[in-house]
Structure formats: structure tokens, C-alpha cells
């Protein structure tokens, strides 16, 4: 097969031009690079629900802290409880700092439990930060009158969830392990908002969810005793739930407690923001700083408080450490955790 010298020369010229553009992009200062750019703050859920709400608040303010005054828009990429978005970041998204976003932290332990199904190693992603730590619990609608100690073995409970990939499903599964016969997950809802509507209509008994989501989106539920909180998933009780038992008070086995710790460790990274693997180092530093500066912004703080959103920021470096600790959980704890999820 003969290849002309002209064709080879032309190919070399194109390659050199592409290389020059790439080098130029890498060499640009952050302010120069982001100037006039449109940045996509993505979220692995449809509009509605807690993740979307936190994403929109962050997207509203983070742009002023990114050098160059770029335009920040929200891009919803729902699917498989944000797994579709994670896979997009992993394989498709540019690594230049123009696309990053929020995903379901429950995928982190799931990636260890079911590595083939998830297909993502969260230690490889670029960690920008987390907007808060979370506190999860399971509840039933107040009219049901269910008491975890007295009624768990006698009354059937239906708990709504979006899918087995959702963060809430982890807590539903742990709760279900207390009485597999009576606690029934009902999957297939598109958003948490749809689950809560079904609960209000009497189609479901309850849900396992985040305290912050309830406080921001259903602020009357707890103060007006519209829901009964059955169990909270943490080692210590939340100040607003002093009379609700923790899962660690109900379980007695130390091995079970270690497995639960693995499953709920991602609570510390409540609203995680990540970029694609191998993001350029200077863009990583720029976005991490922009995130922390946003979290300290008085205007941001005032706006979040109006929406009753809890904020407890975690740096990208610290979030990456927690992701690494989840990934390196001892096999025996992972195996026991897997049984909880069956």
C-alpha cells in the first residue's frame, strides 16, 4: 500500500495544529480560559427534589467566584439515580473544568458492593467539594400511627424509592433487615417529590430520606407532626430528633455496626460535587477555591437560609479522602453490608 508524501505531510500538519491548540488551552490562566465560557453545573436528577435544588442554588452563586465571569447553567442528566451522569463524566465530559456536577453519594458504597454494575471508581474522579453533610431517617405518614418498637413486627410498611441505585434505598434496605416480611420497598418513582405526593395521597406508608430535604421542601412536616420518624442512621442523634432511636441502638452485633458504618459513611459527603477523572490541575484548584469561596459568600448564605437549606461544606481534598476510605473498606465488612442490601 502506497501512501503519498503529501498525505503524510498534511496529516502531520493537522496533528501539529491540534497539539498546538491543546497546549494553548492548557497554558491559559484560569481567568483567561473561563472568560466568555459557558460552564455546565450538572446534576444526575430531573428538575424537582433535593439534589436539583442544591445544584440550582450553587449554580446561581459559584460563577461570581470563578475567574473570568463565566456563565453557569444547570444541566439535568437524570437516569439510574444519577449513574447515567456519573458515566457521562467518566467517559465523555471534557476535562477542562467546564462540566462538573452533583451525583447521588449512595453510588459510592454501591460501587464497592457491585463494581460491575456501577462501573465507576470514585477515587478517580475530581472532587470539588460537598455542600453539606447529611442525616438520613425513615418515616411514615403520621396518620399511620406506626411505632418502630411496638408495631414493626405486626404492621406491614410500604416505603417508596426511585431505584436500587438511590441513596435512600440503602437506608430502606438497612431498615428492611429489621423485619424483611413486613417492610416492603416500592420502586419506580421518578423523583423524591413524587414519592412524597404518593405518601400524602395514602398510596405509600413512608420513605427513607434526608432530614435536609424534608426541612427545605416540606418544612411543615416535622413541626406539625405530620410524619413519624422511626429510625435515624447515625451514631449520634440529631438535635431535632432526640427521641428517635439510631440504627446503632437497635442493632447489637459489632460486625453489623461496622457494615452499617461502611454503608452510611457517604453521609459525610451529603451533596457531592465532582468533575471528570484527570481534570487539569489548575482548573481543579480553581473550582475547589471557587466552591469554598461561594460557601463563605454572605449573599449565598442568606439565600440558602431563606430556603431552609442546611450547609456544612467539605473541601474537595477532604471529600476525596472519604471516598478513598469507602473504597478501601475491609472485605469482611463489605460482605456483611452486601447481605443488608439483598
List each model region and its residues:
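Polar helix-capping/helix-linker motif
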Residues: 10, 154, 293-297
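Cleavable N-terminal signal peptides
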Residues: 14-15, 25
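Sec/Tat signal peptide C-region and signal peptidase I cleavage site
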Residues: 21-27
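Conserved hydrophobic/amphipathic secondary-structure segments
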Residues: 28-270, 338
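An extracytoplasmic/periplasmic, membrane-proximal ligand-sensing/linker region
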Residues: 35-39, 223-226, 250, 268, ...
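A short beta-strand structural signal in non-transmembrane regions
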Residues: 270-276
Amino acid at each position: 500500500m502506497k501512501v503519498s508524501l503529501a498525505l503524510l505531510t498534511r496529516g502531520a500538519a493537522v496533528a501539529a495544529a491540534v497539539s498546538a491548540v491543546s497546549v494553548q488551552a492548557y497554558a491559559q490562566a484560569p481567568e483567561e480560559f473561563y472568560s466568555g465560557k459557558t460552564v455546565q453545573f450538572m446534576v444526575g436528577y430531573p428538575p424537582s427534589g433535593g439534589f436539583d435544588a442544591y445544584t440550582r442554588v450553587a449554580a446561581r452563586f459559584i460563577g461570581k467566584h470563578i475567574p473570568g465571569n463565566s456563565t453557569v447553567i444547570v444541566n439535568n442528566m437524570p437516569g439510574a439515580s444519577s449513574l447515567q451522569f456519573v458515566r457521562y463524566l467518566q467517559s465523555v465530559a471534557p476535562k477542562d473544568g467546564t462540566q462538573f456536577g452533583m451525583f447521588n453519594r449512595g453510588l459510592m458504597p454501591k460501587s464497592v458492593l457491585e463494581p460491575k454494575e456501577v462501573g465507576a471508581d470514585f477515587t478517580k474522579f475530581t472532587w470539588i467539594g460537598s455542600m453539606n453533610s447529611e442525616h438520613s431517617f425513615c418515616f411514615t405518614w403520621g396518620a399511620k400511627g406506626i411505632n418502630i418498637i411496638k408495631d414493626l413486627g405486626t404492621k406491614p410498611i410500604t416505603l417508596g424509592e426511585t431505584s436500587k441505585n438511590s441513596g435512600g434505598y440503602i437506608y430502606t434496605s438497612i431498615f428492611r433487615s429489621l423485619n424483611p416480611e413486613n417492610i416492603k420497598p416500592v420502586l419506580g418513582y421518578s423523583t423524591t417529590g413524587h414519592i412524597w405526593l404518593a405518601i400524602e395521597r395514602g398510596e405509600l406508608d413512608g420513605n427513607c430520606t434526608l432530614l435536609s430535604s424534608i426541612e427545605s421542601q416540606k418544612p411543615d412536616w416535622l413541626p406539625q407532626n405530620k410524619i413519624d420518624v422511626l429510625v435515624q442512621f447515625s451514631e449520634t442523634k440529631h438535635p431535632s430528633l432526640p427521641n428517635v432511636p439510631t440504627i446503632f441502638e437497635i442493632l447489637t452485633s459489632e460486625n453489623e455496626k461496622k457494615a452499617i458504618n461502611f454503608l452510611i459513611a457517604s453521609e459525610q459527603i451529603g451533596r457531592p460535587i465532582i468533575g471528570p477523572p484527570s481534570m487539569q490541575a489548575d482548573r481543579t484548584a480553581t473550582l475547589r477555591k471557587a466552591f469554598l469561596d461561594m460557601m463563605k459568600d454572605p449573599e449565598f448564605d442568606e439565600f440558602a437560609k431563606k430556603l431552609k437549606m442546611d450547609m456544612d461544606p467539605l473541601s474537595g481534598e477532604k471529600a476525596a479522602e472519604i471516598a478513598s476510605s469507602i473504597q478501601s473498606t475491609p472485605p469482611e465488612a463489605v460482605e456483611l453490608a452486601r447481605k443488608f442490601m439483598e
